[in-house]
Amino acid sequence: MYNLRNRSFLNLLDFTSKDIKYLLDLSIDLKKSKYAGIEVQKLKGKNIVIIFEKDSTRTRCAFEIAAYDQGANITYLGPKGNQIGVKESMKDTARVLGRMYDAIGFRGFSQETVECLANYSNVPVYNGLTDISHPTQILADLMTIKEHKGSLKGIKIVFCGDGRGNIANSLLKGCAIMGLDFRIFAPKELFPDSNLTLKAKSLALKSGGKITITDSKEEAVKCADVVYTDVWVSMGEESNWEDRINLLKLYQVNKELMCMAKDDAIFMHCLPAFHDLSTVVGRDIFDKYGLDGIEVTEEIFESKNSVVFDVAENRVHAIKAVMVSTLG
């Protein structure tokens, strides 16, 4: 049986198209098994710890449900529930937890931190998000595209917004490896790192994919099968709202933009999304700037084209596939 036993899941560039296809197929199979009530628990007796430097709803729940479904025990260490970096270094923490647990999940700031965990724990480590990478999210994204479009090859997907963020960067890697036609629609100031773009274009050349980085809406969005966006300001950057809005307001996903994509184009977002006035941030932005939504309008978020909650659910199945393939 093809598997990834004992491997960490830190960066999509560590994996081949065959590896990722295996994980996607396994994700879909695990989802079908759960819905049919015939899921086989392959992680009984396993212990998994998840370390979160950033609070989370979807990522924490996805890790916990994935573990519970497969019979594993899980421990959550939140931003205030441990001594990491205060009384004990991450290097020492990794060696301690590696003696107690079979795998470690991490959600935080630095990619170097999750790599330190992997280097010193001697158990599989799963990257639930860092400032530059979000590989489990992209697995869920690709799974969702495959479910709705039937295939990945040649699918045209456009990311609108900050081309330097962890979602755009991770999509760039994943789409290049898997042969999609990926475009980033962003202001020039927020284009992704040039070295990463060159790497992605090289991978796309081998996979039959295509990479386009542009500030032209027509070039990016025309005939797209998938339109994707993310929040314009990440946690801890709230003071930057005004600058970001001025820079990105022309890159909002709205009816005008969606009309340039295919009629059956799907809209995707990793969540949380600022699309209405029901959050403190959404109301504050509306009061200050009068925007109908921020990165996406309510009309598009709630439209029949929106698959954002399919993506959210698929986080569980994608993370479960990573756990099963590395520990099962």
UniProtKB/Swiss-Prot annotation:
It comes from the Bacteria. Carbamoyl phosphate binds at S56, T57, R58, T59, Q83, R107, H134, P135, T136, Q137, C270, L271, R315. L-ornithine binds at N166, D230, S234, M235. One of its GO terms (molecular function) is amino acid binding. Keywords: Arginine metabolism, Cytoplasm, Transferase. It catalyses: carbamoyl phosphate + L-ornithine = L-citrulline + phosphate + H(+). The keyword Secreted does not apply. Pathway: Amino-acid degradation; L-arginine degradation via ADI pathway; carbamoyl phosphate from L-arginine: step 2/2. Belongs to the aspartate/ornithine carbamoyltransferase superfamily. OTCase family. This is Ornithine carbamoyltransferase, catabolic. It comes from Borreliella afzelii (Borrelia afzelii). The gene is arcB.
